[in-house]
Amino acid sequence: MLRVLRSIHIGVANRGVWPLTLCTPQRGFRPVALVDISQQALQEARARVGLPESACFNDAQQALEQVQADCVIICAPTRFHLPLTKLALSKRLPVLVEKGMAPDFASAVEFVRAVEQAGVPVCIAQNYRYGPMERTILSCISDPSHPAHTGFVYCMDYVQHRVRPEPRTLTYPFASVWDMSCHHFDNLLAWFGPAEWMQAASFAAPWSAYPHDNNTSAIIRMANGTTVNYCHTHDASRGQLVVSLHGQRGALWLNDAGEIHFSQRPTEQFGTRPAQVVPRVEAPGQAGVLADFYRYVTEGVEPGISARNNLQVMAMCEMMVRAITTGRRVYRREIDQQGESRT
């Protein structure tokens, strides 16, 4: 019989909606308390999961003290992730935290240190890696028997333009890096392994409402030899995702319709080869985040989204921040040395 974990949900609006929708007994979860500063958000969450008003709180500590639970799911703004996680860890409760782990690398190191000291499972909800596009690309890169196997990828273009004119909670320095680039970097780590170095720049549109630069570009050299041309914007005039890989065996790319295509690498000057559509693999999406968190809590199987593993993502974010602020190439080994000095 499936063990059902009683979950306290801190932050139930916006990104806090998906866990409430997916946390069902069939998946091993049952919400028992809701925490939010917004009464409207609490009312909507209550209606979604069928909890009484007595299960709603405006204060996380009060909820943790009054409600018996088996885990905590935190979907508050990034700057609150560390203190809220520490609060849950003080009750020795496993935690699932929305991405990004923290608003800066020092906080991320402190976050992981607190998790290790508590000795309880903590995961970061990096849901992109559970998507069909991401899983299909991983298969094409890593499986030599795949019909669309790329071989070694020497170059990749990875661009996401986002129409996000309202800053909302993204008002702190490099918020777009810690909040959104963390997804892209998590994908790169899954596809190619760790990064070796990064050069980067930040910029803003004349019409931007953000107090800090919220657009970034970078050249990233992965340790396996792949070079990534990366760009991410929030001031875009049109939403667009560009994913294009050039491998020894062929090219893999995403078209505007969201289809993944593959063509073999020509060997003649200015040659071309016919493109074929690559079927997407089945992927769990956000349900996969919950499944891996559940397995970590109940079986002790550490997933790629554990806090310890996610520190690798935060290290890439720190590489970008440091490359932008110093105007130089930043090597991963520098970040490792900084992390070691803080532990």
Question: PLM ranges: what are they?
Answer:
Residues 128-209, 327:
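Predominantly a Rossmann-like dinucleotide-binding segment in NAD(P)-dependent oxidoreductases
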Residues 97-98, 122-124, 254:
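Hydrophobic residues in well-ordered beta-strands that form the structural core
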Residues 185-259, 287-301, 336-343:
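Contiguous beta-strand/loop segments that form the cofactor/metal-binding neighborhood of enzyme cores
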Residues 1-51:
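N-terminal Rossmann-like dinucleotide-binding module
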Residues 19, 55-114:
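Beta-loop-alpha module in the N-terminal Rossmann-like domain of NAD(P)-dependent dehydrogenases
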Residues 37, 277-291, 305:
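Active-site loop of classical SDR/Rossmann-like NAD(P)-dependent oxidoreductases
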Residues 110-127, 145-153:
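Rossmann-fold dehydrogenase core element
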Residues 1, 71-73, 294-343:
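C-terminal helix-rich "cap/oligomerization" subdomain common to oxidoreductases
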